[in-house]
Amino acid sequence: MQDLRWPTYAVRDLVLEGAAPGRDPEGRGCAYVVDTDGNEYLDGVGGIGCLPLGHAHPKWVAALAEQAGKIAVAAATFPTAPQRQFVDLLLERSVVPDGRVFLANTGTESNEAAIKIALRATKRDVIIGFERAFHGRTLGSIAMTATAAYRDPYVSCLGEPDERFARMNVARAVFDDLESVEKLFEEYGERVAAVFVEPVQGEGGIHPASKAFLLGLRRLCNEHGALLGTDEIQCGSGRTGNFDAWTTIVGDDPKDAPDMAWYAKALGGGFPIAACVAKAGIAEHMSKGSHGSTFGGNPLASAAGLATLQIMDEENLFDAAADQLPTLHEIVAERPHRRVAEVRGLGAMLGIEISGEGEPAAPLGDILQDEGLFVTVCKGKTLRLLLPYRADETILRDAWARIRRGLDKLSA
């Protein structure tokens, strides 16, 4: 069957059918899928981090079905019961103290909301971002994104700190290098509105920031009157063992908290919902009509998000997620492979760096699909695994066995 979408994706040579029959006997969400030819795969992509519960968790499915029978969409001027409940739970969990929320649909939308509120609240025009960063592909977000291939075709619309083509300008520092951030503050001074950081870089290759670095960003922003925003789109919503990756790395002291944090991906358990949370004193700088979203926080999405947060609590999924990286370290140590340079990450955000010149991991997406495992490859060097939070030792051993076979093929 011909794929008639724009050629913006490296489309896999298969058509997915659904969750694999018999692979979820306890009814807690499935880590395996089948295609229309009946082939089974362990899904280590998970919609790129969107499936914390796995596929077809019965309680999540039931919550969506029940809400679909009531009301699916309402204009944002009409609050709904699931939206109110979802927002209450979200703000209880978010690292941002005394938060107020803007609801959207996708990660890049929540990042755009963060850009708008940072510029509006500070009346400044420079945002500091980082090398290897990924924040989305809409124009504001792509200005923050470090990948030149994504950004450069649109540079005339984006601007740089001394090219006044745009109202927002991006200065880029080195990730986990506080001195490089200090130099940008020295250069741009009171023009700096905010620093945007991923506590764990995902697209950039699964790189966690250090506690000292994140606390240093907090200090610099305090000293210069800038806002600190954390992009929790991929690393947040429980994936690292706490609701926010910031909390996993830094802790939960309110004085260290960021001013803003934004979420998507895992937040809806597989249904699109996103949120940008800002401190109340920052959020008050927005006014009626200053931002909006037709579908943001719609009843279906809110029901999905609410069910996801409730299931995470009921099934202790944050604790389960936290166990994944140490478990994988043990498994790889038992049966190492010479092509593995490093296993790193945080919680259920797993990266396996492959040794070799150039982009040694690039062929592994196709090779591992033939082995019955879906992965993504970051920067040509690192395999990224974003499994359901409850993926246990058995599933991780299965993943590693398939990866070892793939590495043997790569090395042949």
Predicted regions and their residues:
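Conserved N-terminal phosphate-binding loop of PLP-dependent enzymes in the Aspartate aminotransferase
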Residues: 1-412
